From Swiss-Prot:
It holds the Pfam family PCMT. It comes from Methanocaldococcus jannaschii (strain ATCC 43067 / DSM 2661 / JAL-1 / JCM 10045 / NBRC 100440) (Methanococcus jannaschii). GO terms for molecular function: protein-L-isoaspartate (D-aspartate) O-methyltransferase activity. Catalyzes the methyl esterification of L-isoaspartyl residues in peptides and proteins that result from spontaneous decomposition of normal L-aspartyl and L-asparaginyl residues. It plays a role in the repair and/or degradation of damaged proteins. GO terms for biological process: methylation; protein modification process; protein repair. This is Protein-L-isoaspartate O-methyltransferase. Its EC number is 2.1.1.77. Gene3D superfamilies: Vaccinia Virus protein VP39. Belongs to the methyltransferase superfamily. L-isoaspartyl/D-aspartyl protein methyltransferase family.
Amino acid sequence: MDLEEQKKAVIEKLIREGYIKSKRVIDALLKVPREEFLPEHLKEYAYVDTPLEIGYGQTISAIHMVGMMCELLDLKPGMKVLEIGTGCGYHAAVTAEIVGEDGLVVSIERIPELAEKAERTLRKLGYDNVIVIVGDGTLGYEPLAPYDRIYTTAAGPKIPEPLIRQLKDGGKLLMPVGRYLQRLVLAEKRGDEIIIKDCGPVAFVPLVGKEGFQG
């Protein structure tokens, strides 16, 4: 099977297994070429549903995890989304496909080399609705706040206060919490109240920063 056939096969499998359901998420995963975000020696593994090393101690998330996170966040066209942990840019591209031209993805990456490479790939593929910023993602990005949705691609000890502040009322935040025994947590902001839902066990790299783990 060529890469396109492998992509269709893995997405059909994820639909059968219940990880992805909505047309928006399915279409986005079909559209984004995961291989473009990988180092040359890993391109042939682009549609193996597993995390892959991308350098600097970081990974690209498994395809099912990206799809599941998009479903849990209930992303919609026109939304402004904050992503903490750009990595190679794949997750940002999938999010950008869903929010569309009228939406915006603001992605923060603490490792300059990864940010630069991700931005190059995103530009090459035409994702002009993604802004990549080098910085401490645990502090969010105040200049473009508030956000409809926020998610992190790394696990922190708790949800950082700056991210809660930068979330719109009615907005949703999704992040893995914990160091070794991690849980994926969905938080919804309702006025001064934060409603927390546990979405199950996960395994992510640590979220490093002032409001995260110390690097």
